[in-house]
Curated annotation (Swiss-Prot):
It comes from Helicobacter pylori (strain J99 / ATCC 700824) (Campylobacter pylori J99). The keyword Amino-acid biosynthesis does not apply. GO terms for molecular function: ATP binding; ATP-dependent protein folding chaperone; unfolded protein binding. This is Chaperone protein DnaK. Residues 593-620 are annotated as: Disordered. The lineage of its organism: Bacteria, Pseudomonadati, Campylobacterota, Epsilonproteobacteria, Campylobacterales.
Length: 620
């Protein structure tokens, strides 16, 4: 087994590191730099440029220069974020089997293929640096990357000729690099604001254990968004002065993007900067120049809501971890965008403690990934990395309820099973709808996928035992299987492609769950009362039909009337929990005489005892 490299495949820049000689080292690229621009360009001569060389020619070749590809990695074409990216990016985004892809000179490329070209460059540079072949890697992703995005990242590694040993979360990787030598237990918060993504994670480190307590973020919030605010401001100012919509000119837009990024960087150390773009465009009156001063105060006002959005996520993640701000002992700042003074100022003010800037924000994630590579190879001993799943996972059960199988915050890898049953007599198949989210009702959560388990042996409802197993691997990739315990027949689905969950949806789910908590609980109580009533009516009717001859006519009619009344109540969509419970209670009391008659019948069959492991929920 050769050396395992750790790769931070970033939106704006990428970095790599290796663990050797009992320490993690950043690997410089062939240009001698510790980071490589995550940019790929296709020239008119048929060349493919990656990194610095691609960045240098971007202004003259904007439509064939691909940057921020991570923003559409694993994204479905019909998602709002894809439409947003389409407006912002100069290259053409197209629909390929429902997923986002790009078109260059009539040829379609997937985000995995473009990312693979970046990874190939990193792989070649690492081989040059190490003097040996590199075939294995640990690659990092934002903590809030969904299953589809994680799989796409792993596929990019495969295309690049790398065996991706592990996909790990960026803030967790940073904590691994920061906390490896910490002997005393510390609760640290990693604030990771990169070029295109934002993550905040609260972890406990110490004694060579790095355990994630809670994580949150937004896979579509980063330095690019800060740049875009400057671009929009400059374009609006230019239009007011000249009447020209500069954003319609892709070459001008590329120049504007570079100028906005440089202005943002300059304002990290200066209070004012001048943006000077001569001959940015032209009209009938002649060439036009863009010259504009931008103060730090104006930049901060343009981006204030973006910074505040990160603060609100910090608050919710600390709450999810079951901690208070005072219990956070260190705040580790990661990602190039944390150099923005206002970001540092707001995080410091919110947490009320000095920020830890001892780590290089551009390199620490790759360093942590290389340490994880060392762990997997056996070079790093006794280090335990415990990550978590960001949202609950479950299936839809009778009445449209979301029944959770794996709870949010469960340490991964994880494998959990529950036993369900059928909703109808002699039901030949069950449909398993896999869900992700925090709401009580299935329709309010994200559907990840659906599959059918066929060939269930004929049996009364509630008798078949269908074991549903959720298996999340160490990369956070989910497989769901279902098995009929009586026949042994099974079916499984590996969640992928269109089943991915966008990060904006995740955030909305968490917020909606909080807002609708009481309402959802009431709805669930009504559904559970209806399910219980339906089960009682069904079972009592079956028993009455079988033992009616052992009852006098008045008792039999009383029980039948109670069954009918309960069935009418069940059919009424507006029936309340109290009404359902009253009718259920009435039938229970009426059916006591039926129970006595059955007990008195010497040859009455004893009902089969319900399996203790069977969950009181049914699959439609």
């Amino acid at each position: 087994m050769g050396k395992v490299i750790g790769i931070d495949l970033g939106t704006t820049n990428s970095a790599m590191a290796v663990y050797e000689g009992n320490e993690a080292k950043i690997i410089a690229n062939k240009e001698g730099k510790n980071t490589t621009p995550s940019i790929v360009a296709f020239t008119d001569k048929g060349e493919i440029l990656v990194g610095e060389s691609a960045k240098r020619q971007a202004v003259t070749n904007p439509e064939k220069t691909i940057y921020s590809i991570k923003r559409i990695m694993g994204l479905m074409f019909n998602e709002d974020k894809a439409k947003e990216a389409e407006k912002r990016l100069p290259y053409k985004i197209v629909d390929r089997n429902g997923a986002c892809a790009i078109e260059i000179s009539g040829k379609i490329y997937t985000p995995q293929e473009i990312s693979a070209k970046i990874l190939m460059k990193l792989k070649e540079d690492a081989e040059s640096y190490l003097g040996e072949s590199v075939t294995e890697a640990v690659i990092t992703v934002p903590a809030y990357f969904n299953d589809s995005q994680r799989k796409a990242t792993k596929e990019a590694g495969t295309i690049a000729g790398l065996n991706v040993l592990r996909i790990i979360n960026e803030p967790t990787s940073a904590a691994l690099a920061y906390g490896l030598d910490k002997k005393e237990s510390e609760k640290i918060m990693v604030y990771d604001l990169g070029g295109g993504t934002f993550d905040v994670t609260v972890l406990e480190t110490g004694d060579n254990v790095v355990e994630v307590l809670a994580t949150g973020g937004d896979a579509f919030l980063g330095g690019d968004d800060f740049d875009n605010r400057v671009i929009d401001f400059l374009a609006a100012e230019f239009k007011n002065e000249t009447g020209i919509e500069i954003k319609n000119d892709v070459m001008a837009l590329q120049r504007l993007k570079e100028a906005a990024e440089n202005a943002k960087k300059e304002l990290s150390s200066a209070m004012e900067t001048e943006i000077n773009l001569p001959f940015i465009t032209a009209d009938a009156t002649g060439p036009k120049h863009l010259v504009k001063k931008l103060t730090r105060a104006k930049f901060e006002s343009l981006t204030e809501d973006l910074v505040e959005e990160t603060i609100s996520k910090i608050e919710s993640v600390i709450k999810d971890a079951g901690l208070t701000k005072n219990e956070i002992s260190e705040v580790v700042m990661v990602g190039g965008s944390t150099r923005i003074p206002k970001v540092q100022e707001r995080v410091k003010a919110f947490i009320n403690k000095e920020l830890n800037k001892s780590v290089n924000p551009d390199e620490v994630v790759a360093v942590g990934a290389s340490i994880q590579g060392g762990v997997l190879k056996g070079d790093v001993k006794d280090v335990l990395l415990l990550d978590v799943t960001p949202l609950s996972l479950g299936i839809e059960t009778l009445g449209g309820v979301m029944t959770k199988v794996i709870d949010r915050g469960t340490t991964i890898p994880a494998k959990k099973s529950q036993v369900f049953s059928t909703a109808e007599d002699n039901q030949p198949a069950v449909s398993i709808m896999v869900l992700q989210g925090e709401r009580e009702l299935a329709r309010d959560n994200k559907s990840l996928g659906k599959f059918d388990l066929q060939g269930i042996a004929p049996a009364p409802r509630g008798m078949p035992q269908i074991e549903v197993t959720f298996d999340i691997d160490a990369n956070g990739i989910l497989t769901v299987s279902a098995q009929d315990k009586n026949t042994g027949k099974s079916q499984e689905i590996k969640i992928s492609g269109s089943s991915g969950l966008s990060d904006s949806e995740i955030e909305k789910m968490v917020k909606d769950a909080e807002l609708h908590k009481e309402e959802d609980a009431r709805k669930k109580e009504v559904i559970e009362a209806r399910n219980h009533a339906d089960s009682l009516a069904h079972q009592t009717q079956k028993s009455l039909d079988e033992h009616k001859t052992n009852l006098n006519e008045n008792d039999a009619n009383e029980i039948q009337n109670a069954i009918n009344a309960l069935k009418d109540c069940i059919k009424n969509d507006n029936a309340t929990k109290a009404e359902l419970e009253d009718k259920t209670k009435a039938l229970t009391q009426a059916a006591q005489k039926l129970g006595e008659a059955m007990a008195n019948k010497n040859n009455a069959e004893q009902p089969k005892k319900k399996d203790d492991d069977v969950i009181d929920a049914e699959v439609e």
